[in-house]
Amino acid sequence: MSNLDPDAIRAICEDACGSLDVPGGIPRSADAVQQLVFTVGAEVGGRDIRRQIGGPALSWWQIEPATIIDCASSWLRYRPAIEAAITRHLSPGMSLVDGVYDDPLIAAMVARVVYRRSPLNLVCPDDIRGQSRVWKQAYNTPLGKGTEREAVERYMAWVGPNYHPLDGGE
């Protein structure tokens, strides 16, 4: 498994948030972009893992198929602008679950929807501990195996001490 480039992941997250920033969509924010970058560090430690080892989660954002289906059926279907922003990236006949597995842009967009559905506010891009709290409560959930401390450690081991989220890298 190779390590993912944090700047390349940031570019995907920028594109995902930009693609959702349509009338009736989800406004793009630096907080959201960084939360998505942090999530890749928290979930896979920046490693190229697209399918959870011993589990169902998919993509670098490790989204479970049940979560993807729930997002589509109970949230996206009532927000046609956001649904259209995502589904326009799917190949004809491709399910959203397959899209999350096959296309990092789609995966990042769905991860953004997971965070948007949460009542929690996103935090400033340079607040790594705050991002960890949001990740644990809104994404990994209190019942999930991950801890805030482990998430910060995995993220920092991936990006290194000189990575600055506000300027997109070193």
Question: Where are the language model's segments positioned?
Answer:
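Ser/Thr/Pro-rich, acidic low-complexity intrinsically disordered regulatory segments
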Residues: 1-25, 137-140, 144-146, 160-170
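Peptidoglycan-targeting cell-wall enzymes and recognition modules
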Residues: 2-11, 15, 38-120
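Short helix-to-loop capping/linker segments positioned immediately adjacent to catalytic or ligand/cofactor-binding
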Residues: 22-28, 96-99, 120-123
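Secretory-pathway/luminal and periplasmic proteins that interact with or process carbohydrate-rich
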Residues: 44-51, 140-149
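C-terminal/domain-terminus segments
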Residues: 122-145
